């Protein structure tokens, strides 16, 4: 696990096909661009329809490095690496009346140093735990990350799924500790929090709560895509509203609840979403899950979009993700949660190395981009010299600034290639048609989209799945143009046609620059010429006569008073 992020990023070189990267930042930039693009095209979609790969902190991290403060560095590296969905087990200790991360209580005969990591045993398993390491410690790290990425270009949504358990001290359930020794487990009662609400206090200003959702649902209204989602049972705000208007970053909900009602504080349910219907959580043990993908109808797609939110699939030691199943779950509209200790990847059939695991799976976790996309281009095109005669060759990397949908996902393609266009129906985001004719990305009519449809890009995993279904049903062939490009600014992918502006960097082409400055230049030139002419040919009789008059008056005055030279 040492130097995890460096290994993680370095190993991704091969995945993205970087032949001669000058430094690690080049590779990181590719991942950042892929993540930011997927976020940007989903900005108008409700947050419940967003999908991002996640990990179980317990299995992937704590079981390997221990339940201690040294794991905070790894958590930050995972956040910086782009992971947005997290699963975390919490334990309610009846002896201390506090919540803790360690899956075992701390006996009284252990060291009294709360900052020391010690081995504790529970239910015939050993755990390496630090008493002072609590949920609040983890949330402080999340807050630090939120503050450092609280900009329009870097802001993102983080989800945390909690599994809630408690310790059963009864002798019949636990063969390690007898019930009479219960009092020995109150030693570290000062560590941890008695309520979940207080455990999340450090991120309370950025946490989206059930009360926030209730307030939003009372005031929301919309048209277009918003009007479609307004009919949802859980009417969530869009990512744009959530991140850029409400300035929220985090949403938490309970995946599994095994604690009695008495363990919950009065405000816990006002902080965390406990509703069982809030999130659609599935498990790889359900063999029928993937069978339902690939044959969905429009009604099925609309049902998922309106009545299914935060779709996640969690694996386990018995049925871990495989390279094939992982990608299928992603394209099927699920957020895969890594919850096994070992995985099979090419050339390593059973690895436990988290850097190897994430290096392989993370680039394959985008529902939008195909694995390895958007690939690094050694040259960037200047739009002022974007000439079809120069860039028509499909091998020209400088023209690969427009995006097509292919069977594997979004792929950068030559803007001057001729393909058909993806046309989306207004106010019905899961209805697609493929244009009649093929043309370049710069076409004015976008292949003659049918009436009521317009050239667009899928904005969610369900939308892109429905588009794939339309391609299959219509018998069309890939690739298909989608409304996404980075023509104006390299690596800033935008929708709205070939000349849409990047929201993070304004650009002006050479031709447009001439158009902007030409009028001012002409006016300034005329003014300079007029001033020059005035200086040369100026004749001012009034001023000349005034000078003559005063000169004559002074001379006459001097004669009358006899002034000759300077008086002594």
UniProtKB/Swiss-Prot annotation:
Keywords attached to this entry: Glycoprotein, Membrane, Signal, Transmembrane, Transmembrane helix
Principal subcellular localisation of the protein: membrane
Pfam families in alphabetical order: TIM-barrel_MTC6
Glycan-bearing residues: 23, 68, 94, 109, 174, 193, 197, 230, 339, 382
InterPro entries with a match to the protein in the record: Telomere_Capping_Maintenance (IPR051008)
GO cellular component annotations of the record: membrane
Disulfide bonds: none
Keyword Nucleotide-binding appears in the UniProt entry: no
Signal peptide stretch: 1-20
Compartments reported by the entry: Membrane
Function: May be involved in telomere capping.
Name the record gives this protein: Maintenance of telomere capping protein 6
Name of the gene this protein is made from: MTC6
